Regions:
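Ligand-binding pocket segment of bilobal, Venus flytrap-like solute-binding proteins
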Residues: 74-78, 149-213
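Short, well-ordered beta-strand elements
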Residues: 23-36, 53-58, 135-139, 244
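A conserved helix-loop-strand patch within extracytoplasmic ligand-binding domains
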Residues: 95-147
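Pocket-flanking alpha-helical
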Residues: 41, 60-95, 178, 198-204
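C-terminal functional modules
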Residues: 247-310
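Short helix-initiation/N-cap motifs at beta->coil->alpha
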Residues: 32-35, 53-68, 166-178
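Ligand-binding cleft/hinge of the Venus flytrap
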Residues: 44-51, 131-165, 278
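A bilobed periplasmic-binding-protein/Venus flytrap-type ligand-binding module shared by bacterial periplasmic
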Residues: 108-118, 222-236, 259-260
Length: 310
């Protein structure tokens, strides 16, 4: 993992350059393979592109996101889920700036199918009582994901008697496929669940109680998602920073976009993001308040609105 991280950071060095009005106008996003963060990144990319910025986005793991922000090889990450990323955020807090909360009302914790919940598994402490039915496994996401690290912490410290359990490292699509199959067979499965996500519509599921400060937070997985940037970004990009501070999403809006992606596999996240933006142009007034084009001369709102007419 360490070697892989170093290789990615070296690659990022060729992408970064500091920019202000009148110079190169390149903005670099970093994101992870979570549908919601991907959609938000595509929307931000589209708008900034119309304003005259050259915009790129690199897909990596959560730890690499923070390392790249620290080394100033990328600029922006729209996926700082809190409190689950608290540990890595604290590690890098002197090298990043929290610009805004781009979504509240989110959830991130362990989940089970509704039939399992109704059979008595409603709390983390209920899991081990039914260890055999779960095959002592919890299905997680990609390596390096903070949710995985929380589950490992629970297992390694025997929280909720989970010392004999196994974390199954996977990916969002693979985990969802596994959960879908097991639900179709009425099997018992515990997995990382979150909202917004179309899994909440795909599956009749329930979130477990029992989360603590050391796990998914003290409010049973209730979360916020922040926009974070590298140090000095606000000073170098005041115009983009104003836009990012204004950029806010509702859980419902992300759920709707995710559901459309799920229903139509031919669509790419960019297609859905731009379509949704076209259908919700009223948000642009708020998002682009106080924002100019990249050269500092044009009306950002007018430019983006005009783009939907072409």
């Amino acid at each position: 993992m360490k070697k892989f991280s170093c290789i990615l950071i070296l690659l990022f060095f060729v992408l970064f350059s500091a920019q202000v009005y009148g110079k190169e106008r390149k903005v670099n996003f970093v994101y992870v393979s979570w549908t919601g963060v991907t959609l938000k990144t595509e929307i931000a990319k589209y708008i900034l592109g119309k304003l005259g910025y050259t915009v790129s986005a690199k897909l990596v793991s959560v730890p690499i996101c923070y390392m790249a922000l620290k080394t100033k090889n990328v600029d922006i990450f729209l996926g700082n889920w809190m409190p689950v990323q608290r540990e890595i955020y604290e590690k890098y807090k002197n090298h990043i700036v929290k610009l805004a909360t781009n979504m509240d009302g989110a959830i991130y914790t362990l989940a089970v199918p509704k039939y399992v919940y109704e059979a008595g598994v409603k709390h983390f402490k209920d899991l081990d009582r039914h260890k055999d039915k779960f095959n002592a496994k919890i299905y997680g996401l990609e390596e390096g994901n903070m949710g995985n690290e929380v589950i490992r912490y629970m297992i390694n410290n025997n929280l909720f008697s989970l010392k004999d359990w196994e974390l199954v490292v996977s990916s969002e699509p693979a985990m969802l496929s596994q959960v879908k199959y097991m639900i179709s067979q009425k099997k018992w499965v515990a997995f990382l669940g979150w909202q917004p996500h179309h899994m909440n519509i795909m599956f009749d599921m329930a979130y477990l109680d029992g989360s603590t400060k050391e796990t998914f937070g003290e409010n049973n997985g209730e979360s916020i998602v922040n926009t974070i940037v590298r140090v000095d970004f606000v000073e170098e990009y005041p115009n983009v920073s104003t836009f990012l501070k204004n950029l806010k999403f509702s859980v419902d809006s992300i759920n709707k976009m995710m559901l459309e992606l799920y229903k139509d596999k031919s669509l790419e996240p960019k297609d859905v993001a731009v379509k949704w933006l076209n259908e919700n142009k009223s948000l642009l007034k708020k998002w682009l308040k106080g924002v100019k084009t990249a050269d500092g001369k044009g009306d950002a709102y007018k430019i983006v609105m005009d783009s939907f007419l072409n």
